[in-house]
């Protein structure tokens, strides 16, 4: 209790969030508990909550004794945690008994459901509650929360708790099982680049015996999902909605507020007793704009803008306008995912729509400059997003280089960036980068679409050859590749030939013999390359020559190649240790 840091769960916003109540509704009960000597309050630094000290609540000795006297029947039943993936903390929900019963019954029967509703209507809370009921019945929950960089592989990895297969059918098989439910939340956040692949994943999952629940904002980007039943949730009934509001405002006023806001849970959390009762029939988005955003200070709006324009949730430490984080948290504007934070999507969407385009571009430009000073692939991904939306002239060479770097760690994010870039500037080099990335991701259909949009050139022929090879048409691939090599400069032809040989060896199914012959490697004429490229080209060919010799069992070739590699890399190079295994 004397520690400098306190967890957010002990702060007033954290307590209100867990109880499913508006912030003002917990003031009176807390005062009564404190007056009874059951709790104490103090100011402390909240972990991940910004630099300002905030009120936190602790049980006193008497409070602990009272809590221990509670019978087991009075305590909420705890299920054994059977969740895999980033499942959010459970909060208490009100007035959803009918929806809960329906979802539970259908998932227990192995049904596939698409849960839709307006932003902030309570889809995640309802989904989390039904997950708890399933776990109480011994079900394993595989949970994925989507963002703009999520693809089928990322969803599979979240649900499995480890690296996922790439193929949709293989993922569906891996996540299915007896007494298992698959939950995919925030599906509307998926980028159009990955929508088709995730649609295929959901369709594959629908063919298994495992129940699937996809929670998505209406209208769903999937439209109608084959094999899925759509369940749409509405606002709370007035009798349930008033339970979210503080008792101090009186039952008549509470009913007026609940009816005016259509029983919308998030809107009710955002309303303050210090404000007038909203106009009946006022759209929730209009209420957010005219009331919630208007009452924020410049500090609060500055932090909200930074969070709203970011492509991903941020930690408080990553914010460069962090002064307003406490105000936003106190106003129930934020949703927390452990150490990361973002605005509730309803508020984010309204803020994005209301910020003047020129101001938004300026904010993106400033954010890009700040992120450019930070290290790491996450920084490059966020910087690239801001540069794309800044309205500044796009440096396509810089973007292509960074996309290639980002793809080494997160090819899904790289695919989103290159797709967004092409929407802004349909540059030939960006298209070629998109084609190469699609090949690396095992998406020949995406590569084919981009190839059709590229003008005729040797580079296009090389990629058409690769597409033909992936489709198993080796004769056509050889023909296209030779045509491309004949059109390239001598040095570029050598580079392309080396790359083609490496891909021909790598792009094959496990267990299939290599199609590369030692004689093909020996035919590459390195003398056509500039001296600056000789060392790297020679090393690439020797590594390929060694891999081919391993398969053919040529002991003499292996010995000769190893000697060459030692001369180029040194006897102590770690790659040699791997080669010798």
Locations of regions flagged by a protein language model:
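Amphipathic alpha-helical "lid/sensor" segments that cap RecA-like P-loop NTPase cores
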Residues: 247-290, 298-302, 309-312, 321, ...
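P-loop NTPase Walker A phosphate-binding motif
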Residues: 116-141, 218-219, 323-326
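Short capping/hinge segments at domain boundaries that bridge a core fold to an adjacent linker or tail
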Residues: 56-61, 67, 126, 284-285, ...
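Conserved adenine-nucleotide phosphate-binding loops and their immediately adjacent elements
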Residues: 75-103
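Conserved phosphate-binding/catalytic loops and adjacent sensor/switch elements of nucleotide-binding enzymes
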Residues: 128, 135-179
């Amino acid at each position: 209790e004397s520690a400098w840091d306190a967890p957010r769960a002990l702060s007033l916003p954290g307590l209100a969030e867990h109880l499913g109540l508006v912030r003002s509704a917990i003031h009176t009960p807390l005062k009564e508990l404190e007056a009874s000597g059951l709790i104490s309050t103090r100011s402390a630094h909240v972990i991940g909550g910004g630099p300002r000290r905030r009120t936190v609540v602790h049980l006193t000795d008497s409070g602990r004794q009272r809590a221990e006297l509670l019978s087991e029947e009075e305590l909420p039943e705890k299920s054994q945690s059977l969740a895999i993936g980033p499942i959010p903390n459970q909060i208490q929900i009100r007035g959803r008994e009918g929806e809960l019963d329906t979802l539970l019954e259908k998932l227990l029967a192995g049904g596939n459901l698409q849960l839709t509703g307006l932003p902030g209507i309570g889809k995640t809370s309802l989904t989390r509650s039904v997950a708890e009921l399933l776990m109480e019945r011994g079900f394993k929950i595989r949970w994925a929360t989507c963002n703009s960089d999520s693809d089928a592989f990322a969803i599979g990895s979240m649900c499995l708790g480890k690296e996922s297969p790439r193929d949709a059918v293989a993922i569906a098989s891996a996540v299915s099982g007896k007494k298992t439910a698959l939950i995919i939340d925030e599906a509307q956040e998926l980028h159009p680049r990955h929508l088709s692949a995730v649609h295929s994943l959901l369709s594959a999952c629908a063919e298994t015996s495992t129940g699937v629940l996809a929670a998505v904002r209406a209208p769903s980007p999937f439209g109608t999902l084959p094999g899925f039943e759509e369940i749409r949730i509405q606002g709370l009934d007035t009798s349930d909605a008033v339970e979210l509001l503080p008792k101090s405002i009186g039952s008549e006023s509470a009913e007026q507020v609940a009816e005016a806001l259509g029983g919308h849970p998030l809107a009710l959390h955002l309303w303050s007793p210090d404000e007038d009762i909203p106009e009946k029939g006022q759209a929730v988005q209009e209420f957010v704009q005219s009331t919630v955003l208007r009452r924020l200070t410049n500090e609060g709006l500055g932090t909200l803008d930074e969070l709203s324009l970011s492509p991903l949730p941020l930690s408080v430490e990553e914010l460069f306008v962090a002064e307003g984080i406490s105000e936003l948290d106190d106003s129930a504007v934020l949703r927390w995912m452990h150490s990361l934070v973002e605005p509730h999507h309803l508020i984010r969407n309204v803020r994005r729509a209301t910020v003047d385009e020129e101001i938004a571009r300026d904010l993106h430009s400033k954010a890009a400059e700040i992120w450019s000073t930070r290290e790491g692939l996450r920084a490059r991904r966020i910087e690239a997003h801001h540069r794309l939306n800044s309205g500044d002239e796009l440096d396509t060479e810089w973007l292509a280089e960074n996309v290639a770097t980002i793809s080494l760690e997160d090819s899904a994010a790289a695919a989103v960036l290159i797709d967004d870039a092409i929407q802004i500037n349909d540059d030939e080099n960006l298209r070629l980068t998109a084609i190469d990335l699609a090949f690396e991701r095992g998406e020949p259909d995406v590569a084919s679409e981009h190839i059709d949009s590229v003008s005729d050139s040797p580079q296009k022929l090389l990629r058409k050859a690769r597409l033909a090879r992936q489709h198993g048409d080796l004769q056509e691939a050889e023909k296209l590749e030779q045509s491309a090599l004949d059109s390239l400069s001598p040095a570029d032809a050598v580079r392309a030939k080396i790359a083609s040989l490496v891909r021909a060896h790598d792009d094959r199914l496990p267990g299939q013999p290599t199609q590369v012959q030692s004689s093909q490697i020996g035919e590459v004429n390195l003398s056509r390359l500039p001296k600056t490229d000789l060392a790297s080209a020679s090393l690439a060919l020797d590594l390929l020559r060694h891999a081919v010799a391993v398969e053919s069992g040529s002991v003499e070739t292996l010995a000769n190649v190893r000697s060459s590699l030692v001369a180029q890399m040194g006897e102590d190079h770690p790659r040699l240790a791997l080669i010798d295994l």
